[in-house]
From Swiss-Prot:
GO terms for cellular component: cytoplasm. Its main location: cytoplasm. Pathway: Amino-acid biosynthesis; L-histidine biosynthesis; L-histidine from 5-phospho-alpha-D-ribose 1-diphosphate: step 5/9. It is an enzyme of class 4 (lyase). One of its GO terms (molecular function) is lyase activity. Pfam families: His_biosynth. This is Imidazole glycerol phosphate synthase subunit HisF. IGPS catalyzes the conversion of PRFAR and glutamine to IGP, AICAR and glutamate. The HisF subunit catalyzes the cyclization activity that produces IGP and AICAR from PRFAR using the ammonia provided by the HisH subunit. Keywords: Amino-acid biosynthesis, Cytoplasm, Histidine biosynthesis, Lyase. Belongs to the HisA/HisF family. It is found in: Cytoplasm.
Length: 256
């Protein structure tokens, strides 16, 4: 029996409001995170991911109050990320009601933090978020590099090797965003999604670039992802979660 593939709406939150931009810029307001999360819960989303996109850049801690409000009204797994730098940050988020915590920039600067977090809280609640950009030129073997700070700072780290290292350190899941595709609505970067999914034994969530329901299906069928994440197609009413599930089922994908 194939494991069901998950559909995960993503809330990018800036100063307490859900926003969506193109390649992390040109931000437009999509509403109150708690109301939006409740709507997705009612629609049958498998999980919700809440990313405080101001936290790492401005050094602000994720709004625990918003997480508490959301967790009190949403009864599906909630992953929270943004500005997570210490074991205490993780403990605070889990205590506020998060089921999983996503570590991004801090993992790059201190990889052992991932191992410490997994040992302390269990791999099942530690997600490592990877922002990858293609750095190979035309005709070269495809290669992707890790970027931090909302895709602004290159690290020199190979994305596939980095993902494997994170798995070895105890990450329970990888949230993979293609910075080339983010907000562009022309589909996931299936090359990096497949390369990382095939290299790892833990689930990989594909993110960045969904513009239609076929893109979600392609993330699973061609990208080999365990879950697919999308934001704007759901926030602005183009598609509902039930429509996405029905479409994926029609493509032969097992959904919950």
């Amino acid at each position: 029996m194939a494991l069901a593939k998950r559909i995960i709406p993503c809330l990018d939150v800036d100063n307490g409001r859900v926003v969506k931009g193109v390649k992390f810029e040109n931000i437009r307001d999509a509403g109150d995170p708690v109301e939006i999360a409740r709507r997705y819960d009612e629609q049958g989303a498998d999980e919700i991911t809440f990313l405080d996109i101001t936290a790492s850049v401005d050094g602000r801690d994720t709004t625990l109050h918003t997480v508490e409000r959301m967790a009190s009204q949403v009864f599906i797994p909630l992953t929270v990320g943004g500005g997570v730098r210490t074991v205490q940050d993780i403990r605070n988020l889990l205590n506020a009601g998060a089921d999983k915590v996503s570590i991004n920039t801090a993992a790059v600067f201190n990889p052992e933090f991932v191992g410490e977090a997994a040992a302390r809280f269990g791999s099942q609640c530690i997600v490592v978020a990877i922002d990858a950009k293609r750095v190979s030129g035309p005709g070269e073997a495809p290669r992707w590099e890790i970027f931090t700070h909302g895709g602004r700072k290159p690290t020199g780290l190979d994305a596939v090797l980095w993902a494997k290292k994170m798995e070895d350190l105890g990450a329970g899941e990888i949230l993979l965003t293609s910075m080339d595709q983010d907000g562009m609505k022309n589909g996931f970067d299936l090359g990096v999604t497949r390369a990382i999914s095939d290299a790892l034994g833990i689930p990989v969530i594909a993110s960045g670039g969904v513009g239609n329901l076929e893109h979600l299906a392609a993330g699973v069928i061609e990208g080999h992802a365990s879950a697919v994440l999308a934001a704007s197609i759901f926030h602005f009413g183009e598609y509902t979660v039930p429509e996405a599930k029905a479409y994926m089922a029609s493509r032969g994908i097992v959904v919950r």
